[in-house]
Amino acid sequence: MMKEDVIRLNEQLKGKKAEEVLDYFLEKYQGHIALASSLGIEDQGLTAMICGIDATTRIFTLDTGRLFPETYSLIGRTNMTYGIRIQVFFPDYHEVEKMVAEHGGNLFYDSIEYRRLCCHIRKLEPLKRAFQGMKVW
């Protein structure tokens, strides 16, 4: 998107309610738009708004392999509440096994380099897969 397009779009959507802005993007990019949900309160609010407009919109989250049990319960409750299925993307377990075998399970505490490695394997690679085919997220 070019700078001029952003300026034009800002003018077009200026003063609109959040639901109106979401409706615009959900319609314009149908099938190529997704909510990358952290499952935090803000994303739960966006999930409610999006499902009120188009419950077929893709909503996904990442499971790094280090989530709390309550997170899985929240995913289930959210799915039931809105009649949706949040897609869950996981890291490649071979890569996780190799990383943990070589550097330990809490390697991200040991150095910035290991933190980057861990984030790359557990977050960035699954995120790349989740974004395939998407134009807007």
Tell me what each language-model feature is.
Residues 1-137:
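ATP-dependent adenylation/nucleotidyltransferase module used to activate substrates
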